[in-house]
Design a protein with these regions (language model features):
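Solvent-exposed beta-strand/loop surfaces of large extracellular or lumenal domains
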Residues: 340-356
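Hydrophobic residues embedded in beta-strands of well-ordered beta-sheets
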Residues: 22, 309-313, 359
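Noncatalytic carbohydrate-binding groove/subsite architecture in carbohydrate-active enzymes
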Residues: 109-237, 247
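C-terminal beta-strand-rich structural cap/linker in extracellular carbohydrate-active enzymes
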Residues: 351-379
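Aromatic/acidic polysaccharide-binding cleft in carbohydrate-active enzymes
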Residues: 202-300, 307-308
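Structural beta-sheet core signal
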Residues: 43, 95, 135, 198, ...
Length: 379
């Protein structure tokens, strides 16, 4: 909530051009902490979701032009040093969040939001033509809503440098299909250069209503091995990111690092999903992609090598109980290391099993992730 407009510009009636109308201190510290972690920033201009009985900020601004001017001053603070600010070159600026979640995020109809987006995005882009202005972080991918947004941008000349949306599902196929649908629709609407940002996503195999209202159900959905943080979620995570390598998506942002939806518990102990992200991150040390293939929809492989010729392989097995026979050509199998992520092991070494020159991966849980780091080339 520290990035919310009302946190920085607390008095909506104040002068938008007066530096004293802005309070940046906490937001400055928050973003500085993110940058110290080496994280690039995507700044959401708007307000946070309101789960309270009353709604305080999830309403359309009274003056769209003034609201855009406030955003411009915030961008100036972080990119141009205005008002004791910084030169951080934050490139991505997202307008609003989940406007189709009407009660919690936008207490007006969607058509009014789209009009608001057109006014604000165009005004910001005129001032900062080199920045990426986009949004609006729809709750899910809805082709009709996307076409409405694209039509308004074409009508007004407003930018749609990136289109963002969210997704919570346990369906890998749907996660891979969404970017393809978004790309097709945007191309048809005349926006072939618009980036695709699925910038809030997570494995979710529960019932939303029960999850929000039944405490025991919610606890089980969070703690179980087939729940939000368990081995199924971990294998889902690596399966999705593997599949995205062959699709049109520009950026995917996993939700999130902290507590309930995150990769650590309240004691900072990592969940299974942490180790899945770690394995995928380690694979990026081998950036030259190598060809892989699988004859099973629920088993996905991703391989790469480094400039020295050493390779690595990530194997994601989502709800698969059958052993996997893996042939690896041109590799020295005698020195192979195999790490396994399952219900018991957290990306820890296990003894490789070979049969007829193939590596045999035997599932030990409903889902598994294996990582083979630093596979040396054969002689």
């Amino acid at each position: 909530r520290l990035v919310d407009i009302q946190q920085i510009f607390c008095n909506a009636g104040a002068d938008a051009d007066d530096p004293s109308s802005y309070y940046f201190r906490q937001t400055d510290d928050y973003i500085a902490n993110c940058r110290r972690c080496g994280t690039d920033i995507i700044y959401r201009l708007g307000t946070s979701i309101e789960h309270s009985n009353e709604r305080y900020y999830s309403y359309p601004p009274d003056d769209y032009e003034k609201w855009a001017d406030i955003c411009i001053h915030i961008i100036r603070h972080y990119n141009e040093g205005w008002n004791n600010g910084f030169n951080w070159n934050i490139r991505y600026w997202e307008i609003w969040n989940e406007p189709d979640l009407h009660d919690n995020m936008w207490n007006a109809d969607l058509e009014e939001f789209i009009r608001f987006y057109g006014i604000v995005a165009a005004r910001i882009k005129r001032r900062f033509p080199k920045l990426m202005i986009g949004g609006p972080a729809f709750c899910g991918l809805n082709e009709h809503q996307l076409r409405l947004l694209a039509a308004e941008c074409r009508r007004t000349g407003a930018p749609l440098d990136f289109f963002s949306w969210h997704s919570y599902t346990a369906d890998i196929g749907w996660m891979l299909e969404q970017p393809r649908i978004a790309r097709r629709v945007l191309d048809e609407c005349g926006f072939p250069g618009t980036e695709l940002h699925l910038n809030e996503w997570h494995y979710f195999n529960a019932d939303w209503r029960q999850y929000r209202n039944d405490r025991l159900y919610c606890r089980e959905a969070n703690r179980a091995m087939d729940g939000l943080h368990g081995i199924d979620s971990a294998a889902f995570l690596t399966s999705v990111m593997t599949g995205w390598q062959d699709g049109p998506i520009t950026m995917g942002c996993y939700y999130t690092a902290g507590l309930c939806w995150g990769v650590f518990d309240k004691y900072a102990v990592p969940y299974k999903t942490y180790y899945a992200l770690k394995a995928f991150g380690n694979l990026t040390d081998f950036p030259l992609r190598r060809r892989t293939g699988s004859d099973r929809e629920n088993v996905r492989l991703l391989a790469g090598c480094d400039p020295g010729g050493n390779a690595a392989l990530l194997v994601s097995s989502f709800k698969n109980a059958e052993p996997i026979e893996l042939g690896i050509s041109g590799a020295d199998l005698s020195a192979m290391r195999l790490l396994r992520l399952d219900c018991e092991l957290d990306l820890e070494p296990v003894e490789p099993e070979f049969r007829d020159g193939k590596l045999i991966l035997t599932p030990t849980a409903s889902s598994n992730v294996w990582f083979l780091p630093g596979i040396a080339a054969g002689k």
